[in-house]
């Protein structure tokens, strides 16, 4: 089985468009559909035909092009069961623990409520790929619009249980801001400082910072490091529950 091909490009202002292509079957999935034009140009540039859309949550900047792409390609739209009514063109709803096939490969659904109530991630265990959209960012997490911090912390624990070498594709190019914020709560983390410097250089050159890995996030993402003594001491939360430390970090980011 040949490796999947992945193309990443910008949509709107900072959304990532992601296409996942199987060179043997020709199957091509879009991870969300933020904007019609960039997706069509990417497909045309490769000579790919869209067969699937894997929707992660209902926000407009992730579903805007669902209907026009479905009308053009007759592709199959997957999306979260708990947000089914809000997903344009939905064909198959997916709940936590569901599994389906894409081009003969297993796709596992992980419910990650927090950013929205029904947000899901798509995990391809045999390929070591996680499509996390607006749950997990490089050195960050999604803003909590519909569920409390405790729910997002539970979602993060699910993702932290994946293999460290899992490649993570996220939904927005927020990495520079995330890195700068992470340094304010984890200033003594040498790995974080080195990564933040690399990100500064990459973004100055207009280079993307995607993908990341679960292992790298465990080392540098403050939301995954809530048990770290240095972070807790810096926040004045030495004896707090993990979920409370997570919530404090998210609150500080909201005001950063």
Curated annotation (Swiss-Prot):
PANTHER family hit by this protein: HYDROXYACYLGLUTATHIONE HYDROLASE, HYDROXYACYLGLUTATHIONE HYDROLASE GLOB
Homology family: Belongs to the metallo-beta-lactamase superfamily. Glyoxalase II family.
Residue numbers binding Zn(2+) 1: 57, 59, 115, 134
SUPFAM superfamilies: Metallo-hydrolase/oxidoreductase
Pfam family, one: HAGH_C
Keyword Lipid metabolism carried by entry: no
Listed pathway(s): Secondary metabolite metabolism; methylglyoxal degradation; (R)-lactate from methylglyoxal: step 2/2
Keywords per UniProt: Hydrolase, Metal-binding, Zinc
A GO molecular function held by the record: hydroxyacylglutathione hydrolase activity
E.C. number: 3.1.2.6
Keyword Metal-binding: yes
Protein task: Thiolesterase that catalyzes the hydrolysis of S-D-lactoyl-glutathione to form glutathione and D-lactic acid.
InterPro entries assigned: Clx_II_MBL (IPR035680), Glyoxalase_II_hydrolase (IPR050110), HAGH_C (IPR032282), Hydroxyacylglutathione_Hdrlase (IPR017782), Metallo-B-lactamas (IPR001279), RibonucZ/Hydroxyglut_hydro (IPR036866)
Catalytic activity: an S-(2-hydroxyacyl)glutathione + H2O = a 2-hydroxy carboxylate + glutathione + H(+)
Cofactor(s) essential for the protein: Zn(2+)
GO biological process, one term: methylglyoxal catabolic process to D-lactate via S-lactoyl-glutathione
Enzyme class per UniProt: hydrolase
Quaternary organization: Monomer.
UniProt-annotated binding residues for Zn(2+) 2: 61-62, 134, 172
Name used for this protein in its record: Hydroxyacylglutathione hydrolase
Cofactor binding note: Binds 2 Zn(2+) ions per subunit.
């Amino acid at each position: 089985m040949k490796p999947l091909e992945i193309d990443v490009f910008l949509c709107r202002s900072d959304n990532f468009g992601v296409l996942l292509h199987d060179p043997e079957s020709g199957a091509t999935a879009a991870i969300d559909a933020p904007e019609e034009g960039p997706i069509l140009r990417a497909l045309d540039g490769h000579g790919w035909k869209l067969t699937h859309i894997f929707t992660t949550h209902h926000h407009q900047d992730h579903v805007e092009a669902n209907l026009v792409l479905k009308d053009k390609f007759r592709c199959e739209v997957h999306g979260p069961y708990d947000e089914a009514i809000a997903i344009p063109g939905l064909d198959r709803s997916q709940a936590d623990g569901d599994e389906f096939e894409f081009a003969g490969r297993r796709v596992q659904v992980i419910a990650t409520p927090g950013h929205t109530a029904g947000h899901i991630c798509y995990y391809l265990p045999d390929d070591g790929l996680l499509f996390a959209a607006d749950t997990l960012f490089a050195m960050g997490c999604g803003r909590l619009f519909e569920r409390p911090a405790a729910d997002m912390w539970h979602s993060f624990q699910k993702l932290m249980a994946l293999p460290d070498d899992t490649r993570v594709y996220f939904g927005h190019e927020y990495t520079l801001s995330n890195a700068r914020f992470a340094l304010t709560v984890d200033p003594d983390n040498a790995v974080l400082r080195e990564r933040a410097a690399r990100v500064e250089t990459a973004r100055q050159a207009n280079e993307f910072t995607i993908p990341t890995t679960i292992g790298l996030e465990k080392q540098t993402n403050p939301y995954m490091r809530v048990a770290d003594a240095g972070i807790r001491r810096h926040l004045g939360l030495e004896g707090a529950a993990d979920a409370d430390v997570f919530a404090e970090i998210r609150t500080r980011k909201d005001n950063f």
